[in-house]
């Protein structure tokens, strides 16, 4: 593995579906290129993420079990994708054994994948409760219920959602593209579809790119079971510099599309993400909610549209 290349660690806790198969789905090909390693059990699949905002060279690192995770791999993990068998009542037990490592890595993207949830094994409620507790997003490869065709904001599902989440992550070696004047859309992509800035919505059903107002509303959707948090607690948790950070972020997002502006926007997002990563898990969610609300106000959003939103609301 090339030094300094970030990775999305992919593993499977099911004997019927391997991590390599999941990588095939993500890359959309069965003809995979694998980097040679000293340990044949661990495989690195190079992947260049290339979208309209940035490009980044990463590895999809397939690790069959947690005992094969080396210090080098641990240092490079920036996303964690784990597959489990939803038809087995004990399907989440093996996944839970990875939690100490995931908590040490604190990756911004953590996805729990299954073919589909099952009433005879792990049902949707149990899977989502587990996700909420541990900061994951649930993705079904073959969901029983698909989004309505006439939905104004159809949800991404299956492998498409996994690819979308990995594209939305701010990878450490990201290279900005300088020919785009879409700062606000960039922020939507980076903070509205995944767990950037502190896992604000750990187990929402697969979520599309939303306008700012809808995105802010969605922070409180599908969050049953989150702990009660008062405004005073929020204010005591966040960094005193947060308000200044928000104002700068808003200015960069609504400003011009020159290269320097984009680079500063990415730098500020990375800086805020790193700050949030130092907080305990529950505080990270509260921090992310405050960031979303404050940002909405900073760009001129209507307070009425987000009034009353908090992490203890249930829908």
UniProtKB/Swiss-Prot annotation:
Gene Ontology cellular component terms for the protein in this record = cytosol
Sequence ranges of Basic and acidic residues compositional bias: 203-224
Write down which residues bear the modification named Phosphoserine.
Answer: 310-311
- Which Pfam families does its entry note? Adaptin_binding (PF10199)
Gene Ontology BP, a term: protein transport
Q: What is its main location?
A: cytoplasm
Localization per record? Cytoplasm, Cytosol
UniProt keyword terms in alphabetical order? Cytoplasm, Phosphoprotein, Protein transport, Transport
**Region of interest (Disordered), ranges:** 197-233
Q: What does this protein do?
A: May be involved in endocytic recycling of growth factor receptors such as EGFR.
> Which proteins does it associate with, and in what oligomeric form?
Associated with AP-1 and AP-2 complexes.
Q: What is the official name of this protein in its record?
A: Alpha- and gamma-adaptin-binding protein p34
